[in-house]
């Protein structure tokens, strides 16, 4: 039986990890797939994990610890896994981690620029794409980001907390733009996908895994975001169903937007 692996090592946010695992368990049930948390040692050293894995998810948190743990053999195995037919979903920090390079404006005001191994998106990820008060230790930067999707009409809101846009995504013919930020200048790419040999990669700046009904945080900005997402999520929910079907069955189908 195939499995879904969720990375849960240093740098992963416990809060977003819980949302990711809960969402995946909900949507994976019809596919009869087990959702398993794994650490970096597993991805680096476990023999043949690729053969039993349908989807690898790198959730939200902080990219630098991901790189410190997985750089080298870990990212080489992930890249090979995808090229041989596996699927990769990177959310927020997991999306930064999946890009060739990125720029991130730290809460201190300094600009962090880095290159990464995987390069699933061959360009640069830039963030946080909203100039909110992002913090590694609080929810001060949380907001509801309005998205428009390539294949689903209407506007939906998704949770945002420090995520990226994918710079000049339309200039890369191998990249499909799945969703755009609807209230930012130029409507930059918020979610992108790519066919890589036999595999499929999806990178999302916003937290599409977030389940508002399971959020109990009481900060005013979080409450406002939660209410917006709960009230305006029909296109997002349709997209997520479509997305999980593609990832768990590795279907070759999509259009450019």
Swiss-Prot record:
Belongs to the chlamydial CPn_0128/CT_035/TC_0305 family. It comes from the Bacteria. This is Uncharacterized protein CT_035.
